[in-house]
């Protein structure tokens, strides 16, 4: 593996037994594909990868936000927080990997969401709709701006629950491609 792929990571922060990306991510790459919410065929039982040294470049190059954002505490490791934090050109994405209402309304999540919105950092969430279908993505900044400014924890939690309920009802595409 090229050391440049890990030069931006927080020193000493390792995945350990966390396998959130190996299970929950949808991977569609020329070199490798894996459905969302299914364990990768190369994953070992207690975490880790059978082909770690030869794993596809898409796996070598990707890291959750916990691995490269030093301001995130150890509680933010996905298997501990219940949220896989991703980052892309559009900002930070909260992808709950456990019960979305519980994970997204935790004080840990609300502190980061509130701080991000207050600083103008684009935030979104990716909420599962139904088994076998893609998650629904939704921006958090505009719908949460007013309640974040109110600094009312119950108001923020209630608004997040409303947004999660809305997302869960959305029609999304099947994870499995169908021939037309």
Q: PLM features: residue spans?
A:
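Short loop/turn segments that flank or connect secondary-structure elements
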Residues: 1-180
């Amino acid at each position: 593996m090229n050391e440049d792929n890990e030069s931006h990571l927080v020193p000493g922060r390792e995945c350990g037994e966390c396998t959130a990306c190996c299970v929950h991510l949808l991977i569609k790459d020329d070199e490798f594909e894996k459905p969302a919410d299914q364990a990768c065929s190369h994953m070992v039982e207690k975490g880790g990868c059978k082909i770690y040294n030869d794993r596809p470049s898409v796996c070598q190059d990707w890291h959750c936000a916990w691995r490269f954002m030093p301001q995130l505490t150890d509680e933010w490791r996905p298997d501990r927080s219940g949220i896989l934090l991703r980052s892309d050109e559009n900002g930070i994405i909260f992808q709950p990997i456990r019960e979305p209402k519980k994970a997204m309304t935790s004080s840990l999540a609300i502190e980061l969401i509130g701080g991000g919105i207050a600083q103008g950092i684009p935030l979104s969430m990716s909420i599962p709709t139904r088994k076998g279908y893609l998650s629904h993505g939704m921006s958090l900044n505009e719908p949460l701006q007013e309640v974040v400014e109110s600094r009312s924890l119950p108001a923020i939690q209630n608004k997040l629950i409303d947004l999660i309920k809305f997302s869960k009802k959305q029609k999304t595409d099947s994870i499995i491609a169908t021939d037309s």
